[in-house]
A protein has these predicted regions:
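Conserved nucleotide-binding/hydrolysis micro-motifs of P-loop NTPases
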Residues: 64-67, 171
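Active-site-adjacent loop/helix micro-motif of nuclease/hydrolase catalytic cores
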Residues: 69-71, 174
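Hydrophobic/aromatic beta-strand patches that form the interior of the parallel beta-sheet core
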Residues: 57-61, 164-166
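Alpha-helical scaffold elements adjacent to nucleotide-binding pockets in ATP/GTP-utilizing enzyme cores
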Residues: 24, 68, 178-182
Length: 272
């Protein structure tokens, strides 16, 4: 007798659509979100007892590499100071993540707004986001993407009973069909008459969800990025050389004219 799925956990890199996915599932299905199995971003060292995961749906999510790098380079979550700037460091330095520890010399929080007394940060290497093969730092962000994608493709399905890997673009452009597929495949209980579309970020009433940032990388940089990506793996995931989602080979009919809804003022025309 199959066990009814009651919980879900998400696995995906930063800036890969994990928050959008979480809100979409919570808004439409009778499931609770769990973090009992570990971090959604730093998942390669998580521990799973396959025999006891029957009531949990594990969803991996990946994103077009150019859009992902474009966003991640501007939203530098858990990135050490040395890799934050210039862009060349972010792309080609040894890649590792840090735990952000706020060091406040004055307990009066108003000092944050005084330029003469800003908050300072102390960084500690996050050992759960090291190379899971060697236990060392990744050569660069491209090796990190390749190995963590490999984990989601090949290893994660062997660790738990209910796992599926989806593309952020499918969820974004084929929302109803993607949620319907999840519902049918895993016998999920839908709580809405029709699927509700997420518009607000993490239940915020003011912070609207941004579907895609406008690509700010110049064409020569995009070509350089593809030269460092594992093109065979990317093709397996549905991504091909190009700088827009028209190159995403979704299994559904998509609207290729969906506009970007956010632009970034950062200049990334050079990587030096």
């Amino acid at each position: 007798m199959s066990v009814q799925i009651k919980k879900f956990a998400i696995l995906g890199e930063r800036c890969s659509g994990t928050n959008f996915l979480e809100e979409s599932i919570l808004s439409n299905f009778n499931l609770t979100h769990t973090i009992e199995y570990g971090s959604k971003h730093f998942f390669c060292f998580n521990k799973y007892d396959k025999a006891n995961t029957g009531d949990t749906l594990f969803i991996g999510i990946i994103r077009n590499p150019i859009y992902w790098l474009n966003s991640f380079s501007k939203e530098l979550y858990h990135i050490p100071e040395i890799n934050r700037s210039p862009l060349k460091n972010f792309l080609f330095n040894e890649f590792y993540s840090v735990d952000d520890e706020l060091d406040v010399s004055n307990n009066n929080n108003t000092v944050f707004f005084m330029n003469s007394h800003p908050y300072t940060y102390k960084y500690k290497t996050n050992t759960k986001d090291l190379n899971y093969v060697t236990g060392k730092k990744y050569k660069n962000i491209f090796e990190m993407r390749k190995l963590k994608n490999k984990y989601l493709i090949n290893i994660m399905p062997t660790q738990v009973k209910n796992f599926i890997l989806i593309n952020y673009e499918d969820l974004l452009y084929n929302y109803d069909q993607t949620l319907s597929d999840l519902k049918l495949k895993f016998n999920l209980i839908q709580t809405t008459k029709k699927f509700e579309i997420v518009t607000k970020y993490k239940k915020s009433e003011t912070y609207k969800f941004v579907r895609q940032r406008l690509i700010s990388f110049p064409e020569n940089l995009i070509k350089l990025l593809w030269a460092n990506l594992d093109v065979n793996q990317e093709a397996q995931l549905g991504y091909f050389m190009g700088n827009n989602n028209a190159h995403f080979k979704t299994k559904y009919i998509v609207n290729k004219d969906v506009p970007n809804t956010d632009s970034c003022n950062e200049s990334t025309s050079q990587i030096m």
